[in-house]
Amino acid sequence: ISFHTDIRSKKIEELKNNNKLSMLFYDHGKKIQLKISGNAEIHNKNDQSRKAWDQSRSFSKKCYIVENAPGTPSDKAVSGYADEYEYDLPSDEILENGYNNFTLVDIHISSIEWLYLHRDGHRRALFTFENDVLIKKGWLTP
């Protein structure tokens, strides 16, 4: 699993101090919850981040040209874009400046906890990984 974020975000600082993380997903229709745990690998200004950047759409790249870091307090609701880019897509040259802030985070999964919610009884399982290979699986009491 991978995600993109701004190098200036607080989560990057936290992951640099401790690269362990958990993510929780829930599908209401299927009544399935997934808790995924693993270790984050941060890519900024390297081959992996460049490839991800080059594959991103222009509107996605626009997120990384904001002047202030994500989470910066403001007295009013703001997008963070300069006025001239508020409603328009900047040129490719301007968008390229966002690459400095763009970061790819790869998650190396260590475990997946699967939970199926049902009124007649829940079901729960645990899958454990090592070096991206499934090494153990089994049922748990919900």
Please tell me what each predicted stretch does.
Residues 33-142:
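Charged, gly/pro-rich active-site loop segments
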Residues 1-31:
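A short mixed-secondary-structure module that forms the rim of ligand-binding clefts
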